[in-house]
Amino acid sequence: VKEYPINICLINSGFTLGSKIDRDHFFNILTEKYGMYANYEPDSYPGINLKYYWNELTQQNPDVRGRCVCNEYCEGTGVGCGDGQCRRVSIMIFQSGQVIITGCCSIEKLEYIHEFIKTIHKNEYLTNN
C-alpha cells in the first residue's frame, strides 16, 4: 500500500449568531470601525461578503488584524505567514444570523475567525443596536 501525504487546503464551516442581523449596521461596524474589506449589495447577494486576510505577522495587532497590510504585492493566496503571503478567508453573514466561513486551511484559524466574528457581534453589534 502506497502512502500519500495529506495536505488540508480548504475548510468550510457554518454557524449561527443566534439573532437576526441588520446587515447595513453590521456592515458599517466591520468596514468603519474595523477597516475590514467587505461588500454588501443586497440587490445582487443577500449577505455581507467579508474578506479576512490571515497573516501571522498581524494577528497579534488588533489595529490591523484581518486586513492585508503587506508591503509586497499580495493576492490573498499565500500561506498566511510573511510579507505578501496573506491567506484570504471569505465570511458571508446573512440577515438570519447564519454565517458561512470558507477558505480556512486549519481548524485553529477557523476557530479564531469564528471567535472574531462572534466577539464583534456581541461587543459591537448587540450593545449598539
Regions found by a protein language model. Give the residues of each.
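Short, structured motif recognition centered on aromatic/hydrophobic residues
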Residues: 90-93, 98-103, 117
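Extended intrinsically disordered, low-complexity coil regions enriched in Ser, Thr, Gly, Ala
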Residues: 1, 102-129
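Intrinsic, low-complexity N-terminal interaction/targeting segments
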Residues: 1-93
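Conserved beta-strand elements of beta-rich interaction domains across eukaryotes
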Residues: 20-22, 98-99, 105-108
